[in-house]
Structures are given as structure tokens and as C-alpha cells.
Amino acid sequence: MEKVREARIARTLATQHPDATKFVRVQEEPEEAVECLVELGAEEYMVDFEGKLTPYLQPIQVLMELYDAGVRVGEERFVIVRVPSATKENVLRQVQALLGVMEANSELLKEDPDARGIFEVVHPMTSSPEELVETVDRISYARRFASRELDVPLKAGNLRIIPLIEEVPELLDIRNILTGYVEGMREIGMDVSYLRVFIGRSDPALSYGHLPAVLACKLAIFEVYELSDELGVPMAPILGGGCLPFRGHIRPGMEEEFVEEYAGTATYTVQSGFRYDHDREKAVASIRRINELAANDPLQLSGDDIEYLVLATAIFMKHYLSVFFRCIGTLNIVADMIPNTRDRLARKGPVGYARDIPEPDRVGAQCKDLGDVGRELYRELRRMRVEKLPELPRAIKFTGACYTVGMPPELIGTGRGLAEIEERLGEDALDAVISRLYPMLREDLQFAVEYTFLETAGSVLPSSGVAMVNTDLEYCVEYLDLEPPSDFEYQNLVHTLEPYLRYVVSEGGVEEVNPFVRDLLLEMGRMRGSLG
């Protein structure tokens, strides 16, 4: 890969996601950064303010812990910070986080005047180029303020943005978002000499489905490389995913597979479940292997491939949402039972926030110029738009909830989608999806089937939704030749939980989960290799 900045690009990024069964307090995270970068071999660590109760001083604590451990941040090991979204949370929280980064760099410079420190921040939930340019403007403002009022050197405020794009409509529109950002920066006299682009794999699956998330991420990676050539700006994709297939299937022992599946990715996240819910030696060896594997060329997509991809995304999404809209109220209740393993903002309340509701019509708009099938899908998806839903859970808790009731989310909409693609687009399109666009489909679905117990799901969730997933399962077995589940120990835990799940759902939720049930939920997470 072409060199895109003064320092090299990290291959592995350790994050603070709450997808492990181990609880990590915010006070422990500075030591965790040292463990990740020194002991586990990850090349980058992300301090996370987005949706999290991270203290203002954590960037300072992280940099100083690493300095004391002999790590020169910004050379061979790196720290980035995910700041809050000004639109989804508020401007004040974003500016506070930016000032925290600048103050951290200032403290590090006192110890090491040549240190680079933190020089990149992640902008979450990016939906427009204007958001990015406005955040750059806030960085400039915060930099001047910190210099004038806090005696922070201007050098400490040299921060670049990494846009995080994490919904299917935005991933399909990534070309316009990134082009608008680069051109907007040039209009205000600021050049973008390189750009790392964070592609979310987890949240688009929550809102739009497993297959739509996979396909949209593939297209986004391809478009990043195409735009890099067109705009003359070196770009490097980061793929943000977790251990379970619904969230990316980035797990120890599968390095060769996911590096090939998401070809072109420069940096892979190794989230908490990767590090804590697998054998430590295996996790270390896996991180080492990812670091060794060179970034390969992205999947090349022809015009026909892109058309198949967009239409298939719409078809799978339609079938996913037909279940999601029926079951999300009940799944929310189960999701609230999943233990918290980081100090997060609440989903509800004055300082909490929830994900936006799905917007199928926006995906449909991408189809309307793609022939008769595209126009029909556009009309179908417009009719599916809803104005109000219960507040959505986080993707990790949603995934954990689906596995807990015996209905892994990877199955939802997949089988019916495959059947409709064959019927409406033909065998060539079906073969493109299964063989070229998503080679790991069978392996990912076989993993999910090991935890599938739809009888239990049917006793907890609305029967109409579970019946659709049963049809999905039948088609998946037919198209992908899947084997029945063989993990009877896990099945016994699902059956043990079933009466309690029915009780909690009938009550509309509980204030406090039974400690025995909490232990069962954590044990189930350990068995599948991640809480959610």
C-alpha cells in the first residue's frame, strides 16, 4: 500500500467495545492500553468518548501510562480517540473530548518534546461531509482556545479526522460523503494529504441486516480505493467489527479468512471479545498474524457486480426488516438483560442516546434507476418506512439478545433473500452473492446455526417473526447445505433460561436481572466467543 502519512498505518486497532464477558472499568482502561500495545501486540488503541462515560482526563492517563512503559506514541504504536458526535450527542461533549486530547498531547510534550502523541480523532456516525468540515472548524477553534487559555502548544492541537461511516445508506453513499469532505476542505484552503476511513460493520447490521452490512462494507472499501485515485488523496480503510459473524467475524484463528473476505482493509479492530473471550495465547498469535499479513488489493467490482450488490442489499434488507419491525420491542426487553461490561451511557435518559431508526426508503432510492426490479424495490421499500420505533438497543446487546433467545441475527432475512434473488435477478446474481461477493457466507451461517433454537425463540418472540426466520433457516439449509447444531451444552443453557425469558417479557422488563441468570448470560457469551 502507498504510504499515506508520515507514520505507517497500524494493522490492528484495540478498542473499548463492551462485547466481552469481562467487565473493564474506565479506571482500568489506561492500564488496558499498555496491555494491548505492549503485551498483546496490537499496534493502535482507541480511547472512546462516544456513548461512554469516559473521563475527560483519560487521554492524559493513557499517554502517560504508555510513556512510563517506554512506548513512544505516534511512531510504532498509536493512540486515536473517538469523540462524540455533535449531532447525536452534543457539541459540548465533542469539544470537551477534543480539548482533552490536546491537553494530553501537551502533557506528553513536557516529558518528550519530540513526541507525536495523538494526531487523529474518529468522527462517529458520519452522515454528511458538512459534519466533518464543521468538526474540523471546531478543532481549529479548540486549538486556539487551548493555546490562549490553557497554555497548550499549538502543536498539541494538530488533529486530523477519521470519518466513521456506519449505516447502510451512508455506506452506499460513501463516494458523495468523502468527495464532499475533500472538496469542502479545499474550499476553505485546507488540503487533505491523506485520509483514513473507518467503515463500521456492526451498526449497519443492527439497523439493516447481516447481508446488507456485509455487501455495503464491500462496496465502501472498493469506493475508497476508487476515490483515492480520482481525488489524488491516499486513503486507508479501517474495518470495525466484532467476533460474531453478525458483527464481522473478526476472531482469533480466522485471520486468513477475514483478511481475504474484507480485502483492501488496512486496519482491523480487535475488540474486547477478541482479547478477553478467547485463549490469551491464541489471541496474541492472531494479532501477530494480522500484523504480518500485508493489506491485499480490494475486491474488484464491475458495473454488473455493483448493480447486483445494491439490488441484493435492498432485497435482504426488506426481509430482515420484516422480522425486525415485529420483534424489536421484545428483543429490546431481552437486550436490557445483557450485562454491561463497560461504563456506557444509558440507552434512555437525559444523557443517553439511541441509534436512528432504519430508513429503507433511502436504500430504495439507490435502486430506482436499476431497471424494472430496482423500480419495484424502490416502491416496496418506500412502503416499509416507519416514523417511530422503540429506542434501538446497541448492536452488541441486540446481537447478544438474539443469541440468548435462540435466534441468531445472521439468519434473519437471509434465506428468503437468497430465494428472492434467484427468482428476480437470476442464478448469475445468486452465484455472485454466494461465490464472489461473500465467500464466507456458508461458514458464517454455519456458525450461527450452532446456536439456533427457534422453538425457544417462538416461546419468547412474536410468532409471526419467528415463522419468517424458520423459513429463512429452511432456505439457508437448501442453498448452503448447512448442518444441524451440535452444541448441546449451549442448547441446555438456552432451555434453562426459557421460563425466565418468558416471565421477563410478560412483565415488560425487570429492574434487576437475577444473579444466576446474569451468570448464565455471561457463560453463554464465553461459549460463543463474545457477549454480542
From Swiss-Prot:
Highest taxon of source: Archaea
SUPFAM superfamilies: Phosphoenolpyruvate/pyruvate domain
Pfam families per UniProt: PEPcase_2
Molecular function via GO: magnesium ion binding; phosphoenolpyruvate carboxylase activity
EC annotation from Swiss-Prot or TrEMBL: 4.1.1.31
InterPro entries documented for this protein: PEP_COase_arc-type, Pyrv/PenolPyrv_kinase-like_dom
Extent of the signal sequence: none
Protein name: Phosphoenolpyruvate carboxylase
Cofactor(s) recorded in Swiss-Prot or TrEMBL: Mg(2+)
Subunit structure: Homotetramer.
GO annotation, biological process: carbon fixation; oxaloacetate metabolic process; tricarboxylic acid cycle
Free-text function comment from the UniProt entry: Catalyzes the irreversible beta-carboxylation of phosphoenolpyruvate (PEP) to form oxaloacetate (OAA), a four-carbon dicarboxylic acid source for the tricarboxylic acid cycle.
Stated family: Belongs to the PEPCase type 2 family.
Keyword annotations from UniProtKB, A to Z: Carbon dioxide fixation, Lyase, Magnesium
Annotated catalysed reactions: oxaloacetate + phosphate = phosphoenolpyruvate + hydrogencarbonate
